[in-house]
Amino acid sequence: MENRERLGSRLGFIMLSAGCAIGCGNVWKFPWMCGQNGGGSFMLIYVICLIVLGLPTMIMEFSVGRAAQTSPLYMYRKLSGGRGKWNLWGIVCLIGNIALIAFYAVVSGWILYYFVKFLTGQNQDFGFEKMITTPSVNVTYLLVTLLIAFVILSFHLQGGLERITKYMMSALIVLMLVLAVHSFTLPGAGEGLSFYLIPHFSKITGSVVVGAMNQAFFTLSVGMGGMAIFGSYVGKDRSLMGESIHIIILDTLVAVIAGIIIFPACFTYDVEVTAGPSLLFDTMATVFNNMAGGRWWGTLFFLFMVFAAMSTVLGVCENILAMVRELTGWSRPAGCVACGVGCFLLALTTALGFSVFHFQPFAAGTTWLDFWDFLVSNNIMPIGSILLAVFCCYKVGWGWNKFLEEANAGKGLKVQPWMKPVFKYFVPAAVLFIYVYGMVNFAWK
């Protein structure tokens, strides 16, 4: 395989990393989790988790990736000098990214389907339940989603992924601001924003904390190499703490603005904010269908969602592609064909899981989507974050001094020595406690 590719600019690195973080986790999963967990209460815990858990983990991921100059498949083995069994977690990172795309690409296909329906004026002729139980719709839009992603990735890094992501992220921010301004004009804006932004401390429970932590890791794509791959594409001219803060701020702003767009509309048209995964589909489609000029507002809304979803699909597929190419030595085009076919076949489990390939992994009503989401969000990401902290802070792995040197190389904000207890003790202990609490609660459901 050719020498390692590089991103063309600092802006490209920030936009690409933010694009991977900003996706369905912000515009699909965050609003309905917020609605089901008390609105402002969930928001408060979520922001705390981003700062005290997500930020240190992101800095560690970028550092490991930049130091190793390899994909997550080999970075642990390379930096540990072959000690221990760290190479096994590289394999888990590959499995985790494939499992993520197995349901993420399907959800992205749903968003693309809704965009096409609104754009073509067919927004009255479909529904969420009808869509997910129609095999031809799910399979077709899954195929289109992955085809778009791997065609873009088949070009070299700067001319394909970096350039497209810059355009998509810029368009996404503009669309979100237009939609947010419109939401402020709705009659239910005050009530919706009050529910969304004002915390009610009586609603903060253990389940809310677990959900907020899992959502923080899910949206930042940390714990299984989602950020490390982009760290491997940049030089050492900027320190990684400042870059991580910029990315988290962008990610959080998109999540917050998504709620500002959605909750005023829900309260204006008296729709249920606890609708769950269908909130962004049936609920918002109903809102737009009853709104003056709703077809065009709906088109803009789902176009912004397409950009958000595709930015993450591209990031995850790039990670899978990089690992497979390092494993096989294939060129970008050849790797794209193989990875595209493999991801499509695995994602068929989710696409057909609501109809002809029905599977209930946990309880009545659960599907393949729940299985893949549980595997990635509730297990691989938090466990990966614990192992990453151990790897970066203890001699059994890479070690604190080497991590600190890498994280602080270049201009910008530095990780301070007094922060060591946060990285070494607080992050792994807090994540482990919340993870075990969540597993116990899950087992007793």
Model-based region annotation:
Residues 1-29, 57-62, 66-88, 235-239, ...:
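Membrane-interface "cap" regions at the ends of multi-pass membrane proteins
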Residues 3-5, 32-37, 67-92, 105-160, ...:
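Inter-helical loop and helix-membrane interface segments of multi-pass membrane transporters/permeases
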Residues 74, 108-133, 234-237, 242, ...:
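Helix-loop-helix connectors at the membrane interface of multi-pass transporters/channels
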Residues 88-97, 328-342, 371-431:
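C-terminal membrane-solvent junction of multi-pass transporters and transport-like membrane proteins
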Residues 2-3, 7, 162, 166-310, ...:
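Membrane-embedded translocation segments of transport machinery
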Residues 11-49, 226-231, 241-245, 249-252, ...:
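Transmembrane helix-boundary motif of multi-pass solute transporters/channels
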Residues 6-17, 42-45, 84-98, 142-145, ...:
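Select transmembrane alpha-helical segments in multipass membrane proteins
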Residues 6, 12-14, 20, 136-140, ...:
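Loop-to-transmembrane helix boundary motifs in multi-pass membrane proteins
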